[in-house]
Curated annotation (Swiss-Prot):
Cofactor stoichiometry and binding remark: Binds 2 Zn(2+) ions per subunit.
Function: Thiolesterase that catalyzes the hydrolysis of S-D-lactoyl-glutathione to form glutathione and D-lactic acid.
Reactions mediated catalytically: an S-(2-hydroxyacyl)glutathione + H2O = a 2-hydroxy carboxylate + glutathione + H(+)
Name listed for the protein in its UniProt record: Hydroxyacylglutathione hydrolase
Keywords linked to the UniProt accession: Hydrolase, Metal-binding, Zinc
Residues at which Zn(2+) 2 binds: 60-61, 133, 171
Cofactor: Zn(2+)
Length: 255
């Protein structure tokens, strides 16, 4: 039976997510940006939280853990490399590990760059990728702890997933990401189409996610750093994809 996924807006622009297994009743929260909205969503659905799957240690992704764990006595799954930064963890995971949420299975991908401990969760049976702050729609996370080559390799790992996977990212940044991407690839038809879609979604007060990875591969300039026309557009023709990516990220940082 397919999982039920709910998007839960938290804080200013964070996305919380609940993924529920109807067959067992198990429910996981992907990160815990803020307890109150997640509790309200759980109570609305009549679900009990059994697990919190943490992607990285930043406060806007773990701030609700203590309250949720106290209320639901749920298991906290965290990156192995987070160590003491996520003290409430009951299980620490690394690349290739599989986390079970009732009958659902999430495969762990290590995706460092934004932070060194960052992981993503792939629910293959439900074609769902929870990438938090590694990959955004039409964007990617800032590189705070890792290096640009490290982040590029993480993006390549996610780009290798099938086109029909749906991306669930950590923040609603898509409109600003589109604005930047159009300065690099103004003639990209897929990006132009996504820009119109995003304008309609935000105008109606709807989230811009999920979006398929297939769409992102065509429209997200940060996933296209190895495309010659992208390198040429920023004066980096002939440079390595990692260097092109780094220049794109620097430009976005300063935009």
């Amino acid at each position: 039976m397919a999982a039920d996924i709910r998007i839960v807006p938290c804080l200013t622009d964070n996305f919380g997510y609940l993924i529920h297994d109807p067959s067992s009743g198990a429910t996981a929260s992907i990160d815990a940006p803020e307890a109150a909205p997640l509790i309200a969503a759980l109570e609305k659905e009549g679900w009990k939280l059994t697990d919190i799957l943490v992607t990285h240690h930043h406060g806007d992704h773990v701030g609700g853990i203590a309250e949720l764990k106290a209320k639901y006595h749920c298991r906290v799954v965290a990156p192995h490399d987070a160590n003491a930064k996520i003290a409430d963890a009951d299980l620490r995971v690394e690349e290739g590990d599989v986390v079970k949420v009732g009958g659902l299975e999430a495969r762990v991908l290590e995706t460092p760059g934004h932070t060194l401990d960052h992981i993503s969760y792939v629910f293959a049976d439900d074609r769902a990728l929870f990438a938090a702050d590694t990959l955004f729609s039409i964007g990617c996370g800032r590189v705070f702890e890792g290096t640009y080559p490290m982040m590029w390799e993480s993006l390549l790992k996610l780009r290798a997933l099938p086109d029909d996977y749906k991306l669930y990212c950590g923040h609603e940044y898509t409109a600003s990401n589109v604005k930047f991407a159009l300065t690099i690839e103004p003639e990209n038809a897929a990006l132009q189409a996504r820009a119109k879609q995003v304008e309609q979604q935000r105008g109606a007060g709807r989230p811009t996610i999920p979006v398929t990875l297939g769409e992102e591969k065509q429209a997200n300039v940060f996933l296209r750093a190895d495309v010659p026309s992208v390198a040429a557009a920023i004066g980096f023709a002939g440079e390595s994809a990692a260097d092109v990516f780094g220049e794109l990220r620097e430009r976005k940082n300063n935009s």
